[in-house]
Amino acid sequence: MTALQSVAVIGAGTMGRGIAQVSALSGFATRLFDVDAGILADAIQQIDQELAVGIARKKLNEDERALAMSRLTTVNDLDAAVQQVDLVIEAVPERMTLKQEIFGQVSAQVPQHTILASNTSSLSISEIAAGTPCPERVIGMHFFNPAHIVRLLEIVRGRQTSEQVVDTVREIGRLMNRELVVVNDSPGFASSRLGIALGMEAIRMVEQGVMWHEGVYGRAIHFKVQFAAHKKHGISQN
């Protein structure tokens, strides 16, 4: 595996633009792809605004903002977006057929060392990989919303994902200043299943008269459950 320098993010929606911001801030030459030029323009504007907020909060300086924006380019041709990149992160809507179509097209265009990652929060990485000639290079990189704030990264190992790819993605995650959890491919992975368990327990408390639903909701907001779990245990709700 060559040293990773460039990243292509596929999809410029809420998650894609957040991932692109993290990637560019972390020093990677980053291409952000979407079929809609208007969405791309909006994404770049939002990323720049988020970086300005970071400056106001003294999280970064003007030079770091300028460098991040200089590393970020937009592309509305998928084949061009992935040419000679080291890592592809797909962040399109959660439809298996769409993801398989994209991975099939991308796998035919990228170099043999390129890692193909999906930001899916629940779809099978092994099933996504099945439509490619290189399932050993397909992995899950599940970022959490908003990606530039929530540092958790759930790395999902497919049935055929190589350990070298897992190790490389771990290192990428560290370079992106993420808090890492590595899981095997299973329905919902770890984060979504834990989120469901938390939600079910809240329902039981209401059913058993332990708390009223307003109280459960209020406590969840007060203690910021979705982020407290992430900070304390390395897990989070998405």
Predicted regions and their residues:
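NAD(P)+-binding Rossmann beta1-loop-alpha1 motif at the extreme N-terminus of oxidoreductases
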Residues: 1-53, 57, 109
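Amphipathic alpha-helical segments at domain termini/boundaries
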Residues: 21-25, 32, 66-87, 168-177, ...
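Rossmann-like NAD(P)-binding element
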Residues: 35, 39-42, 55-116, 122-124
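Rossmann-fold NAD(P)-binding glycine/threonine-rich loop
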Residues: 101-152, 157-166, 170
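Internal alpha-helical scaffold of NAD(P)-dependent oxidoreductase catalytic cores
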Residues: 155-186, 196-224
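A short glycine-threonine-serine/GTX helix/turn-capping micro-motif
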Residues: 185-193, 228-229
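Interdomain hinge/lid region at the active-site interface
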Residues: 212, 221-238
